[in-house]
Amino acid sequence: MGISLSKRRRDNNNNHHHPHHNPPYYYSDPPPQQPPPQNGYSYSHNYPVSTPQLSLPPPPAQPPSSSQPPPSQISYRPYGQNYHQNQYYPQQAPPYFTGYHHNGFNPMMRPVYFGPTPVAVMEPPAPYVEHQTAKKVKNDVNVNKATVRLVADDLNPGHYLVSFVFDALFDGSFTIIFFGEEESKCTIVPHLPEAFPPIKVPFQKGAGQKFLQAPGTGIDLGFFSLDDLSKPSPEEVYPLVISAETVISPSSVSEEPLVHKQITQAVLEKTNDGSFKVKVMKQILWIEGERYELQELYGIDNSITQGTAASGLEDTGGKECVICLTEPKDTAVMPCRHLCLCSDCAEELRFQTNKCPICRQPIHELVKIKVESSDEQH
């Protein structure tokens, strides 16, 4: 019996009674003031409630004060019926809503937000960039556009002759046309055929050959204004057009000869010393019935394309992608023509930004280019 009473006393000493309090965020008005606890770490704010615009009923009456000691002095939980009669249970006042919201510093209280629900602002997605795969074509003849010049005709003062360097895989012919316009199937039509008839000159296959127009067949540019020579007309009539053409014999009698062309369109600018400089504006290919416009790519290795008839490419850096710095670059950015990305980085870039990583110009499209060695079959 003594052991049982001792155990019950120990249980009573170890179980302390803590009166139940509703969480303060259930009240829109500050909760009723409670006696301060013994630890002294709780603070209550007694701010007056001022609601001049609302007519509110008086708060309910508080329960009568009791002669019992404060809750903090009760330290025994009732275990049986004999303890209930001496136990003190504090009564809580019902919630009283007044429109007053207490936003004091209290981690247990929820902040009150007035106004519409905030809407998350989403950033607009990057513009979609079209991703294409380049088609490799074989150019039979190429005019090196950096070597196109006008040379004075010594036998005819005031006249100029056309000169340039070219590479050819097959025999063919050049047609020099002054003030010519491109029509269907890359056919060049002269606008002044009576005054300046087209001049056709044959050539043989070979690399690094130099072409010079025959004396006496040049043009006198003194009849034209500088404005007409320095830019194409609205109808796309260029002052100088060079058409290089090769004809491949068919394998059978029933087939027609295969005609390939490269067309170089240029304007003429007068320099300070009185001479004229050729500025190539566009180069066009006509291969197997398809029209292609040549554009230089910046960042490709010229050593890969050595031995071909026409590279038209410039090397401006390493072979690695400028994003990951590991994979070889095989994708060009248009229209700035920077070959600087690998296919994987280009696929990610097209959904994230529309700026070239080299020059930061807008990207219109991405072109994947597969560079092969010259001895591979096409």
UniProtKB/Swiss-Prot annotation:
* Residues covalently joined to lipid (N-myristoyl glycine): 2
Gene Ontology biological process: protein ubiquitination
Task: Give positions of the RING-type zinc fingers.
Answer: 321-360
Q: What pathway does this protein act in?
A: Protein modification; protein ubiquitination
Q: Name one Pfam family in it.
A: zf-C3HC4_3
- Disordered as annotated region, ranges: 1-79
Keyword terms of this UniProt record? Lipoprotein, Metal-binding, Myristate, Transferase, Ubl conjugation pathway, Zinc, Zinc-finger
Q: Which InterPro entries match?
A: LOG2-like_mRING_C3HC5 (IPR045195), MGRN1/RNF157-like (IPR045194), Znf_RING (IPR001841), Znf_RING/FYVE/PHD (IPR013083)
Q: What spans are recorded as compositionally biased (Basic residues)?
A: 1-21
Under the GO molecular function aspect, what terms does this record hold? ubiquitin protein ligase activity; ubiquitin-protein transferase activity; zinc ion binding
**Listed Gene3D superfamilies:** Zinc/RING finger domain, C3HC4 (zinc finger)
Q: Where are the annotated segments for DAR2 domain? A: 164-283
Q: Record's family?
A: Belongs to the RING-type zinc finger family. LOG2 subfamily.
Q: What does this protein do?
A: Acts as an E3 ubiquitin-protein ligase, or as part of E3 complex, which accepts ubiquitin from specific E2 ubiquitin-conjugating enzymes and then transfers it to substrates (in vitro).
Q: What is this protein called?
A: Probable E3 ubiquitin-protein ligase LUL3
Its lineage reads: Eukaryota, Viridiplantae, Streptophyta, Embryophyta, Tracheophyta
The gene that this protein is the product of is LUL3
